[in-house]
């Protein structure tokens, strides 16, 4: 049976579903943003790390070759000896700087001193897998949200035969309980209390998607119009009952 309380309850239940999906999507997008920011740091730093490792490898190889050459070089090749000594000293200095930079980079990401590029790749792969999982969830909840919005619009269309003010007031009366129930469902699903700021954002998004501001304005106008009518009727009645005035 289509009655004002039944329609009000149906609309508020659908509104609660919209609110839940808005919150979950906001939570997912926040997680995605966090991972994307991390990846934007990790990926270039992995390139930097592999670059440092490559430079250390090349300079170590060059130093080793020059040390061997110097060892084999006859003493009377004074000029070459000096050139080799200068170059070896430069390479030692370069290697110290590169190793120090590499150590600081590992420290920044809380890796062990002997960690290799594999550690970076492993963490990047974990983040990318997490991002993919969140993207799948985002798609799922976006579809669910669209479905709830369609159902809401269909039920709203059926409610046109009822007094909009009466329906609005019936909905407002049960909304606090429905919203509390939504928060409980979110807490059960996410194993944590909903974040207040995110929850407020989800409520604003729900209101926007359901066009609640326009609906509220319309109801206020109807109430104001009704009051004016009542006021006019009351004046007209008084005039009829007191013809001398």
Tell what function each PLM region has.
Residues 1-245:
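Extended intrinsically disordered terminal tails
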């Amino acid at each position: 049976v289509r009655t004002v309380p039944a329609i009000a309850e149906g609309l508020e239940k659908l509104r609660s579903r919209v609110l839940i999906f808005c919150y979950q999507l906001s939570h997912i997008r926040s997680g995605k943003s966090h991972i994307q920011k991390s990846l934007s740091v990790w990926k270039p730093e992995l390139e930097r790390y592999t670059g440092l490792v490559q430079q250390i490898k090349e300079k170590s190889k060059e130093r080793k070759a020059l040390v061997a050459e110097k060892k084999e070089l006859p003493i009377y090749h004074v000029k070459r000896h000096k050139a080799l000594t200068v170059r070896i000293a430069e390479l030692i200095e370069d290697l110290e700087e590169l190793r120090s930079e590499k150590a600081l980079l590992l420290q920044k990401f809380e890796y062990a001193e002997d960690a290799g590029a594999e550690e970076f790749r492993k963490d990047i792969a974990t983040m990318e897998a997490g991002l993919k999982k969140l993207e799948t969830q985002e798609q799922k909840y976006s579809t669910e949200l669209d479905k709830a919005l369609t159902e809401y619009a269909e039920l709203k269309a059926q409610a046109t035969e009822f007094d909009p003010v009466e329906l609005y007031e019936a909905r407002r009366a049960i909304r606090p309980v429905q919203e509390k129930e939504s928060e409980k469902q979110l807490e059960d699903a996410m194993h944590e209390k909903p974040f207040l700021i995110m929850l407020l954002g989800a409520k604003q998004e729900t209101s926007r998607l359901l066009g609640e501001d326009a609906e509220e304005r319309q109801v206020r106008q109807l109430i104001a119009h009704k009051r004016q009518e009542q006021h006019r009727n009351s004046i007209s009645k008084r005039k009829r009952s007191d013809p001398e005035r």
